[in-house]
């Protein structure tokens, strides 16, 4: 069986609220860690979300 190209990752808020998004990325083409500015409803602002592993 072939190795899956798409990995599930967790985007964790840098505002230390514990809020996160779950998304997928192609591990073969995107080798660097993802970083997005997304909405954090806990602080009610757009903040940076960085990639972490799902435990």
UniProtKB/Swiss-Prot annotation:
Write out the entry's keywords from A to Z. Answer: Ribonucleoprotein, Ribosomal protein
Which Pfam families does the record associate with it? Ribosomal_L33
UniProt keyword annotation of Ribonucleoprotein present: yes
Q: What is the lineage of its organism?
A: Bacteria, Pseudomonadati, Pseudomonadota, Alphaproteobacteria, Hyphomicrobiales
Q: PANTHER family in the record, alphabetically?
A: 54S RIBOSOMAL PROTEIN L39, MITOCHONDRIAL (PTHR15238), LARGE RIBOSOMAL SUBUNIT PROTEIN BL33M (PTHR15238:SF1)
Q: Which cysteines are joined by disulfide bonds?
A: none
Entries under HAMAP family matching the protein: Ribosomal_bL33 (MF_00294)
The protein, known as = Large ribosomal subunit protein bL33
Organism for this UniProt entry: Methylocella silvestris (strain DSM 15510 / CIP 108128 / LMG 27833 / NCIMB 13906 / BL2)
Extract one GO BP annotation from the record: translation
NCBIfam families reported for this sequence: PRK00595.1, rpmG_bact
MF terms from GO for this chain are:
structural constituent of ribosome
**Keyword Signal among record annotations:** no
Q: Which GO terms describe its cellular component?
A: cytosolic large ribosomal subunit
